């Protein structure tokens, strides 16, 4: 029932959408993506390739790259193999599902995303998922974030992110609380 509701919410959006699998819904035999028809949603592209794949939203000049998660292990590199910026796109968005690892810190956690990888990425914006608390990862080299969760209050409120990418003006990122969810 929750999945069907979620699919309808996505289908009701007036814009193209992209999605990658995460650690709770890996691309496993008999998993959620085999039990429900995500491809039936006309405005959704589900990115599943283990090595990553590129989606083009030509009407907006946008290229989106992401990678399907088959197994949530320390060997899975969510940003590994990301291609350089395509020459003919106006905006380049990346998607990755894993745990942020700050500069100089080791990690034995599954699906690590090192800050150096974020800063070296060619994306105008990098959308990250894994933990439910919102986190901005903005430096002179990169703009990335975990948007948080619109359904729970880990970190003080249910949250979502608004990203504006302007051709000659850079990327603006704002994390907002869903009204009425602040826990103070």
What are the residue ranges of the model-derived segments?
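His/Asp/Glu-rich metal-coordinating catalytic cores
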Residues: 1-159, 164
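C-terminal functional module detector
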Residues: 152-184
